Curated annotation (Swiss-Prot):
Residues 4-50 form the F-box domain. InterPro entries: F-box-like_dom_sf (IPR036047), F-box_AtFBL13-like (IPR053781), F-box_dom (IPR001810), FBD (IPR006566), FBL13/AtMIF1-like (IPR050232), LRR_dom_sf (IPR032675). Residues 297-346 form the FBD domain. This is Putative FBD-associated F-box protein At5g44940. It comes from Arabidopsis thaliana. It comes from the Eukaryota.
Amino acid sequence: MEEFDYISEFPDCLLTQILLNLPTKDSVKTSVLSKRWRNLWLNVPGLRLRTFDFPVFPYPYEEGFVRFMDRFMEFKCRSRLQKFMITYFEHNGYRDRLMELIGTLVDRGIQHLYVYMHTCNRVDFIRQNIYKSKTLVSLKLYNVELKNPEFVVSLPCLKILKLENIFHGEDGPLVVEKLISGCPVLEDLELIRPFDDNVGYGSLTAPKYSRNRDIIGDFLTVISSVRHTIICYSTSKMLYSYSKQLGPIPQFHNLYHLQARFSSSSLQLLPTFLESCPACPNLKNLIMEFPFEPKNIDFHKVPQCLISTLEYVQIEELILKEKSGIKLVDYFLENSAVLKKLTLSFTYHSKKKQDPESYKKLLTSTKLSPTCQIIID
């Protein structure tokens, strides 16, 4: 049977969009396929690079990266990139050139910017034009330093923001608050604190914490419009402390996807948090992680979202026990009226020790939603 090359029938505009999803080093390799493909990668509206992918001879790979980008930007001088993703490993001090390059990309109207810095020293990343970008739709930063801007941030198109291992100097959360407050259409927000971030909240009612209290309150108000959020244990603890000491947290009217990580002692925060935000009238997806066996589960509150909107629940890293894991599962099955699927995944260690009777009890739990499926992963 004669083979047919369907890909060659695709127009160039479709091929470049396909190549956009590949690392640039793989996109470049397609240039050997045929004469048509020789320069096609140059028309891809984005780059996905790692500095150590460049050869170390005759230049250090960082210099090779800079030379490559200079030539590429010269070739694309009259067009703008949709996406730029860089994983930067620094050894010879070319970060200033990288920052200049990113500033140029922003000036040219970049839409998606992802920067992952692997350096020994913190890098002051954001330039003024990034704070004022009219085209950025998604921004993801790792291991950089953000300094407090002395002007109003304006990112009118930014919908996705991820900040991981970010350093803020002396101004702390105020920097993030300013950044988020300038994003009127923000939908997805992910904040992951550095491992050595020792910020504590203490008693928020104490006078010495008044500044933190105000910052947290303003910050919660700013992020209350997000649709998708991921929170760690320390964040859930802060929310719980705020609601207990200072009153209800702002309502998250648009929130439809919540992912949270709990310790063995903090699970009790879950219904309180959900109830504190009636706040979740649109919540449909809930993902929970438990690196330890949950204890002292005694849920009496049933948030409105469980009754009216919650459709998918996923519980990860669970260890089933008669009075903990099963009770947690029962809580959702017995109170979620429109639940469509409950997915349970267990730690490898837990799977080896699991009592088969535990699975049977899960499958026979009383379900308020008759169509709910229980998936054991």
